[in-house]
């Protein structure tokens, strides 16, 4: 069975085509700058080379039509006819409290995703554009929605409620939802497969750390807490997002700067985090280079960044009554060995010992990086959200 996975953003589409019989990735690529000058599709060809094709792409439907034409192209394609695609799996960012698992898309599901759109105004409408485009181009093709938030719907109320008037929750759904759920689910399961231990019996902390980042506590196979909240702003220090901050500080800044809600949103989403604190970049590689050169703000920023991750790991170990496995994933978690070392150092009190030699220089591969006598297994697992979406799509179709 061939399953196309789509991740539609406001001006982009990422895609992967899987042959689920073999688990092979048949094709992958993405479109950038939809509706803007200089739009292009980039793909990896059969020889592993990167190819860029420029073309005017006014909307998502034209973008997906372009993707289908490339998939069937004599030079770059891997299928003869797009009708060989059996189903489509879509990343949908926010399912609110409506969706605790992936679902086959119908009109009722679309309506509920629209209702959740005020919780993810930049993402859900774009995700639905992909759904509508596929229905227009291949009418009747089965489509499945896989939600970033669904995995975290097992959190207890004491973990997801904020200390605000209860009416804010009842009227507007103001609570912690969490994100990166598909990634946290994939890497936690994959870690247990690698280690040969039963998923349902473990206390796992997953650290998805990249330009965006979140930590999740998984007890007996269920998410019991996560660092992101109503929005992806809460929690860790991120590339341009502030992470945890005193809400009173925000009202103070608004008053001092004469700032409205839109200005505040821009501040905490786009002008804060690693970039705002360092004044250098949102890229941790550039921060590490500046640290090596002795830049004091870079040093402070890196310390804040690592400290925040360490603090959440400790908090979630306390919340679960211990930790059996710590999983690193995401762009930084998979590749920045110095961050992994800095966070895991001095955690021996909770049975966590990192193998400095194994960790150093290790990038982008599955590997245990804890010492043999570490009570907590520390493991790096590169995430594969697209495969998880394809697997969910296959499972739902098998149940039809």
From Swiss-Prot:
Pathway: Metabolic intermediate biosynthesis; acetyl-CoA biosynthesis; acetyl-CoA from acetate: step 1/2
Localization of this protein: Cytoplasm
Enzyme nomenclature, EC number: 2.7.2.1
Upper classification of the organism: Bacteria, Pseudomonadati, Bacteroidota, Bacteroidia, Bacteroidales
Organism: Parabacteroides distasonis (strain ATCC 8503 / DSM 20701 / CIP 104284 / JCM 5825 / NCTC 11152)
Function: Catalyzes the formation of acetyl phosphate from acetate and ATP. Can also catalyze the reverse reaction.
InterPro entries per UniProt: Ac/propionate_kinase, Aliphatic_acid_kin_short-chain, Aliphatic_acid_kinase_CS, ATPase_NBD
Feature type site, description Transition state stabilizer: 180, 241
Quaternary assembly: Homodimer.
GO cellular component terms attached to this protein's record: cytoplasm
Gene that produces this protein: ackA
Cofactor binding mode and count: Mg(2+). Can also accept Mn(2+).
Catalysed reaction equations from the record: acetate + ATP = acetyl phosphate + ADP
Keywords, comma-separated and alphabetical: ATP-binding, Cytoplasm, Kinase, Magnesium, Metal-binding, Nucleotide-binding, Transferase
Obligatory cofactor(s): Mg(2+); Mn(2+)
Protein's recorded name: Acetate kinase
